Amino acid sequence: MFCRKYVFQTWKQLSRSYSTVNSIGAAKTRNIGIIAHIDAGKTTTTERMIYYSGRTKRIGNVDEGDTVTDYLPSERERGITIQSAAITLPWNQHKINIIDTPGHADFTFEVIRSLRVLDGAVTILDAVAGVEAQTEKVWKQASALNLPKVVYVNKMDRPGAGFSRTVQEVIQKLETRVVLCNLPYFETNKESDLEFKGVIDVIHQKLLKWNETDANGNEISVVNIDETTPDLLQILEKSRESMVETLGEYDERIIDSFLEHDENYLKIPPMLLDQVIRKATIDNYLTPVFCGASFRNIGVQPLMDGITKYLPSPLETSLPQITKNGKDVTKKVDGEKGLVVANDNNLTLALAFKVMTHSTRGPMTFVRVYSGKLNAASNLINTRTGKKLLIRKLLVMHGDSPEEVKSISAGNIGVIPGYETDFQTGDTLVSSAVAKRNFTAKDSAYRLLPIDIPPPLFNAAIEPHTAGDEAYMKQCVETLIREDPSLKVHLDKEMGQVVLSGMGELHLDIVRERLVNDMKAKVNLKDVVVSYKESFVGKREKEAVITNEEIEVAVTLSHIEDARDYVGQEGALVIEEDNNVILLSETASSEHVRATIDERRWKCENNLEELKEAILNGCLTALQMGGPILGFPLHSTLVTVNRWNVPVEVAQEQALNLMNASRQAVQSLKDEKKDFSILEPIMSTKVYVDSNDLGEVSHDLTQRCKAMIVEIQDQSTQNLETAAWAKDEAAKVYVPPDYTIKKNVSKFDDIANKKIIVAETPLREMIGYLSKLRALTRGRATFDMTLIGMRRAVGNRVDSIVEEYKF
């Protein structure tokens, strides 16, 4: 046995100069996200990575509020991640761009927009809780983007930690093959309890044991596992056999090596194992698994090794979807330049995936450069606006600390500072790697796949203290919306209030805190309420005709079930967020308008497309102005423009008149309340409870929360109704027994004794549910919700909603 500083700490000096790190090529760059359920240890793990890379001289602590990545006052006060933070680290002659994402369901959009620009992900699991609800949700989001992943089983030092159980859940719940790159190592303490001390490196056949006297986790004892350590050797042999069997089914080189080495699993070279694991990970064939206890500084360095060894570089990841004028463009990967688009080595394409306003540095736009090189002191075009901008400076962020750089090359993440109103989340930016280039309209035709924005579910009204405070309040709200596109705003004209709409209670609480505490806006804050809708449910279609001098618009209102049925239909504007459709066919224009076009007598100051857009905008405005019951926005409604006419042979502007007429036509159809109903959001709710609490929680759901229980599932891995493949795969993987569970059985609740209550619940009844659930179960239960859709409220439900919105 010998003791030394961990070998990769010798590379720490490189981190002192970002210019050195920035010179690292795409092949040795890793863009990764840290994803997990809340409280799994994402930020704690990230802070250790920052320290071990040499970026900081001390380890940031969530409890002490001095973390690098959680730097917002609200984050440090609450001890949770709210905004995704970006940081660049050097490690093992590689560059790792890390984004530490939120774990709370209210900030799912932060996760979504971060995943879009990443090449891989580290999924952190709590070894006591196992695979939790938000983990499953984010895993599916990452899988939909074909992101390769590694798993890190954290908190192995906690009573009740179950590595074996957690691995089985990974296979069955996340439906992935695994290879266990390291295993937990325990020693018995004076109280005869097992304590987590280190990890068994299955690939290199070593025991890594962290020195308890070193508070920062730098000193690690490395022990060869051989005949002198028979117990460890037995575990290693079984683990190696399981690893080789899994890898052998993927790559024949493993089988060949096994036969060449006298069918000895331990003699297969680590280098070959690493190569095959890397290839299989990038192909999403399997997931490497690591373990540790980040708070005690155990296991983080091997995880960082795994990131550089197994996750892909920008040269190896799935190519982004890029279009030009709606058509796919050619893409190829150059070993030196990275992604080359449209056979143009100098074409630079970047995606603005996040916009924020810093308290002292002002506006900051986070970008992922996909092709070419984004240079400081160069021009770019925002393809959404067509506007040409001079980029003066570029930054790379380390949590809350920026470093100015001369360029951001393909495959990297950086920041454009300044430009308060010029960028929005999802913008495609076009530039050139060469200094001088004349941009044309063709350059504005490029589009990277936009970022989907989920619909908001909760509302909260705000009012300025005085009329003099209104302008600054609106300015602050506009800033928040640019930063967070999942936050919506509309004006309640009747009440004179600005209404914010967000993803959840916590989401809106944080927004309101930022308005008052960070931005110093003088506003009154109202309670968070559910976002309801209204829908036309009349038995017949209703038609209205608005005639104003020579302008005429005729529209019909009807109910629809699924707006997606109209996607691709000619003349259909589909608003998926509200399940609405506006149908404007080519034949809707009057014979007079069509004849004017054919005879070339058109004198109107607006062209045909501008007039059509005016009609659509007028109809859309009317839908958003709400229904006749309580003024909620309309939902599941089809507006059909049957005909329209304007005097296009007259030389004057008609778009505004046509838009107003369209709005009035739709508004006139909302005169009778009996033709409309209130829709409320219905959630698919999963409540995770101990068997002992099942009855009381179920009763509370059905009686107080007005829930309809769909089924009750067993949460233990032995009874999960998963695919036969996942069960077979779990049976093939060797994991050592969870001795910690057996030894400490009296110190924690049996996790295998948990149930899942699956129910459909009105969202309104789930406000504040977490605190009530914890009170019922003494803090042992959790829950997760996803939106099923909007459902018609009937009977007493309507009365309670109307009562809620009386002012």
From Swiss-Prot:
Chain ranges of the tr-type G domain: 27-315
Subcellular location field: Mitochondrion
GO cellular component assignments: mitochondrion
Transit peptide, residue positions per record: 1-18
UniProt-recorded Gene Ontology molecular function terms: GTP binding; GTPase activity
PROSITE patterns, per database record: G_TR_1, G_TR_2
Pfam families assigned to the protein according to its UniProt record, in alphabetical order: EF-G_D2, EFG_C, EFG_III, GTP_EFTU
GO-annotated biological processes: mitochondrial translation; ribosome disassembly
Primary localization: mitochondrion
The keyword Transit peptide is annotated on this UniProt entry: yes
SUPFAM superfamilies, per database record: EF-G C-terminal domain-like, P-loop containing nucleoside triphosphate hydrolases, Translation proteins
Cystines in this chain: none
Binding site for GTP: 36-43, 100-104, 154-157
Keywords: GTP-binding, Mitochondrion, Nucleotide-binding, Protein biosynthesis, Transit peptide
UniProt function note: Mitochondrial GTPase that mediates the disassembly of ribosomes from messenger RNA at the termination of mitochondrial protein biosynthesis. Not involved in the GTP-dependent ribosomal translocation step during translation elongation.
Family stated for the protein in its record: Belongs to the TRAFAC class translation factor GTPase superfamily. Classic translation factor GTPase family. EF-G/EF-2 subfamily.
Protein name: Ribosome-releasing factor 2, mitochondrial
Organism, scientific name: Candida albicans (strain SC5314 / ATCC MYA-2876) (Yeast)
